[in-house]
From Swiss-Prot:
One CC-aspect GO term: extracellular region
Compartment list: Secreted, Cell wall
Record-stated family: Belongs to the PIR protein family.
Span of the signal peptide: 1-18
Entry protein name: Cell wall mannoprotein PIR1
Keywords linked to the UniProt accession: Cell wall, Cell wall biogenesis/degradation, Cleavage on pair of basic residues, Glycoprotein, Repeat, Secreted, Signal
Protein encoded by which gene: PIR1
PROSITE patterns: PIR_REPEAT_1, PIR_REPEAT_2
Gene Ontology terms for molecular function: structural constituent of cell wall
Domain remarks: The PIR1/2/3 repeats are required for the covalent linkage to the cell wall. Their number varies among different strains of S.cerevisiae.
A Gene Ontology BP annotation from the UniProt entry: fungal-type cell wall organization
Site (Covalent attachment to cell wall glycan): Q74, Q93, Q112, Q136, Q155, Q174, Q193, Q212
């Protein structure tokens, strides 16, 4: 019995030593492989739009909507076919709604990103993702993706319309987006999460205060005249889509393989495999905090993979780098230039 207890204790110690702690150097948290031809430095600020992989081929001529971020940094998006821009909320998380036409994603205070999930996710116009406060990224399930915004926690959310709406970010950094087919821009809420609606038309994604990213997923995205291509520091510019920048739109910078949002938070894959913005430094237990690139096709990649998964959580999606459940769909996170309209 004493021997068994010693083995268990040793295993626990080994696990704790392997986990990332905020005091450790986070810039070394990189995947072992890199994307062939990927660009690790991009001189311009850009957004992202959630594009369902199943509809990518048919939406090559369209622009996805930007993702917004909410305050928490999460990224979210609605589920509309038209992809809406993703916004970011305050916590930095990224989320998206489930509309077929993705609605624009905005960011709420926790940083999460949300967007609608509409089916019509148009790559040509791609709506910007916004960020909420928490930094998380989320999206609605509309076929036309709606724009993703960011709320206060940084989560990112966006609608899931097919026309990709811009993703916004809410305060927590999560990213969210609606699920409309037309992809809406993704916004970010305050927590940094990213969210998006599920509309098919992709709407631009926005960001709320928590860092989450949110965006609608409208499938049909509107086409914006493109200005002179943004300069890059290595390779050929792969970013061919653009969207109008608005308040709350998830704005990102890529330098040396490190991805940051407009609040300077670090884009990372956290312990539960979710994509969101935190810190610096990234949250304890983070798996990757570096190794980001833009692929020759114009998609965001971590290591050698450019496939992410939007997984339904209530009325929005969270973004992950792995398939974690039955309600998850494979998506690309299309990089889009943000322009003043």
């Amino acid at each position: 019995m004493q021997y068994k207890k010693s083995l268990v204790a040793s295993a626990l110690v080994a696990t704790s030593l392997a986990a990332y702690a905020p005091k450790d150097p986070w810039s070394t948290l990189t995947p072992s492989a890199t994307y062939k031809g990927g660009i690790t430095d991009y001189s311009s600020t850009f957004g992202i739009a959630v594009e369902p992989i199943a509809t990518t081929a048919s939406s090559k001529a369209k622009r996805a909507a930007a993702i917004s971020q909410i305050g928490d940094g999460q990224i979210q998006a609605t589920t509309k076919t038209t992809a809406a821009a993703v916004s970011q909320i305050g916590d930095g998380q990224i989320q998206a709604t489930t509309k077929t036409k993705a609605a624009a994603v905005s960011q709420i205070g926790d940083g999460q990103i949300q967007a609608t999930t509409k089916t019509t996710s148009a790559k040509t116009t791609a709506a910007a993702v916004s960020q909420i406060g928490d930094g998380q990224i989320q999206a609605t399930t509309k076929t036309k993706a709606a724009a993703v915004s960011q709320i206060g926690d940084g989560q990112i959310q966006a609608t899931t319309k097919t026309t990709a709406a811009a993703v916004s970010q809410i305060g927590d950094g999560q990213i969210q987006a609606t699920t409309k087919t037309t992809a809406a821009a993704v916004s970010q809420i305050g927590d940094g999460q990213i969210q998006a609606t599920t509309n098919t038309t992709v709407a631009p994604v926005s960001q709320i205060t928590d860092g989450q990213i949110q965006a609608t997923t409208l499938t049909s995205a509107t086409i914006i005249p493109s200005p002179a291509p943004a300069p890059i520091t290595n390779g050929t510019d792969p970013v061919t889509a653009e969207t109008c920048k608005s308040s709350g739109t998830l704005e990102m910078n890529l330098k040396g393989g490190i991805l940051t949002d407009g609040k300077g938070r670090i884009g990372s894959i956290v312990a539960n495999r979710q994509f969101q913005f935190d810190g610096p430094p990234p949250q304890a237990g983070a798996i990757y905090a570096a190794g980001w690139s833009i692929t020759p096709e114009g998609n965001l990649a971590i290591g050698d993979q450019d496939t992410f998964y939007q997984c339904l959580s209530g009325n929005f999606y969270n973004l992950y780098d792995e398939h974690i459940g039955t309600q998850c769909n494979a998506v690309h996170l299309q990089a889009i230039d943000l322009v003043n309209c």
